[in-house]
């Protein structure tokens, strides 16, 4: 029998898929290349659409309890130290969208998924098990691991991230696009955060060709710092240690308040961001893609994790109601492509128009965003944050 669903990758997308499948009564084997489970990075922003999907997976309440519910989304002009716009996230926001906006430590969130999967009794996770290839057969798919061993299943889901091995056979489109944007990350204790910036908000400082983001994590005990510049970098990097001086040099044109944070950070690390153009087909027979393997996106809409969780809910819905797995995967692909492509495209656009604008473009941004009321924002972003998408997958 080949009833197990095989999932390559035990990150947020892969475990969300396993949990969604378990809620439909389906067993899965999650194949993770790392020697142990874990997540790299600090913070994740969870908008209401992520929580709608987490509710469908049965862990919305525990995720709401674990996250930090920030009071506002705040955009500041880092060149003038003046507010561009803000959106309150309290009662009106929650009533409009049906869920909160929160930030959560990536490791804490991953831990919630691991625990939830374990409790189902239907999810097996194997480490040191990198999927490097696969073969489709009429009645099964065979996942081929790095050590040459093979595992058979009804379906293979490539949730193996930006540098997905599974994608290279499903689509074969080579390496991701190097964006030329470099991100620096650090986490600082709350007591080291300047009191004038110790805000319970997700704050973005927009500069010329750069921006800075900070928000609290772990119940406000630490602050996550994420700084991004249009560096023109042409080679991918991930987690390279760098000096504080290097970071300051990239952002020194901004005002004192935002740049004062740079010297509060320590153990700065550097990433060069990559994404891909939207492509409409993620399916090859009994194999499909999910999350960053399917639609990697820039960080500017803070939707990478959210889209992966939505993918998981949709995939479980289609596999749960369709006897033919090949047909189910095609329906999943069709259901998810337009939405994820829109977020990929908007994420690129937001970097130029909102976060890194210069001169007249920055002035236009300030005028347009500053003129929006909270209701204007709610209505504009409802296509993304609203319940309608996940409601289709129930």
Swiss-Prot record:
Optimum temperature is 25 degrees Celsius. One of its GO terms (biological process) is catabolic process. Pfam families: FAD_binding_3 (PF01494). Its cofactor is FAD. Optimum pH is 7.5. One of its GO terms (molecular function) is 3-hydroxybenzoate 6-monooxygenase activity. It is an enzyme of class 1 (oxidoreductase). Induction: Constitutively expressed. Up-regulated by aromatic substrates, the best one being 3-hydroxybenzoate. It catalyses: 3-hydroxybenzoate + NADH + O2 + H(+) = 2,5-dihydroxybenzoate + NAD(+) + H2O. InterPro entries: FAD-bd (IPR002938), FAD-dep_Monooxygenase_BioMet (IPR050493), FAD/NAD-bd_sf (IPR036188). Inhibited by manganese, copper, mercury, and iron ions. Its EC number is 1.14.13.24. Keywords: Aromatic hydrocarbons catabolism, FAD, Flavoprotein, Monooxygenase, NAD, NADP, Oxidoreductase. Belongs to the 3-hydroxybenzoate 6-hydroxylase family. This is 3-hydroxybenzoate 6-hydroxylase 1. It comes from Aquipseudomonas alcaligenes. The gene is xlnD.
């Amino acid at each position: 029998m080949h009833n197990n669903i095989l999932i390559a990758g035990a990150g947020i997308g892969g475990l969300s898929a396993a949990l969604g499948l378990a809620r439909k009564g389906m067993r899965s084997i999650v194949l993770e290349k790392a020697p142990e489970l874990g997540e790299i990075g600090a913070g994740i922003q969870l908008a209401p659409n992520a929580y709608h999907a987490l509710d469908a997976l049965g862990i919305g309440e525990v995720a709401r309890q674990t996250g930090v519910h920030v009071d506002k989304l705040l955009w500041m002009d880092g060149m003038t130290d003046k507010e561009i716009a803000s959106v309150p996230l309290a009662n009106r926001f929650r009533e409009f969208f049906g869920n909160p906006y929160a930030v959560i430590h990536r490791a804490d969130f991953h831990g919630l998924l691991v625990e939830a999967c374990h409790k189902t009794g239907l999810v097996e996770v194997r480490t040191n098990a990198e999927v490097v290839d696969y073969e489709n057969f009429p009645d099964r798919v065979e996942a081929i691991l790095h050590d040459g061993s093979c595992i058979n299943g009804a379906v293979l889901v490539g949730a193996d991230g930006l540098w997905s091995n599974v994608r290279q056979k499903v689509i074969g489109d080579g390496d991701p696009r190097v964006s030329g944007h470099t991100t620096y990350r650090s986490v600082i204790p709350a007591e080291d955060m300047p009191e004038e910036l110790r805000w319970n908000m997700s704050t973005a400082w927009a500069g010329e060709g750069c921006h800075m983001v900070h928000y609290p994590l772990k119940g406000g005990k630490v602050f996550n710092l994420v700084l991004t510049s249009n560096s023109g970098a042409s080679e991918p990097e991930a987690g390279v240690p760098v000096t504080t001086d290097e970071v300051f040099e990239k952002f020194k044109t901004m005002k004192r308040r935002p740049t004062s944070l740079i010297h509060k950070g320590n153990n700065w690390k550097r990433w060069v961001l990559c994404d891909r153009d939207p492509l409409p087909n993620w399916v090859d027979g009994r194999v499909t893609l999910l999350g960053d393997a399917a639609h990697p996106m820039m960080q500017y809409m803070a939707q990478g994790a959210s889209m992966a969780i939505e993918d998981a809910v949709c995939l479980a819905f289609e596999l749960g109601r369709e006897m033919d797995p090949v047909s189910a995967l095609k329906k999943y692909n069709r259901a998810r492509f337009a939405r994820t492509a829109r977020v990929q495209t908007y994420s690129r656009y937001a970097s130029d128009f909102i976060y890194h604008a210069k001169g007249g473009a920055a002035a236009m941004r300030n005028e347009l965003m500053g003129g929006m009321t909270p209701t204007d924002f709610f209505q504009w972003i409802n296509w993304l944050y609203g319940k309608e998408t996940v409601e289709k997958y129930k």
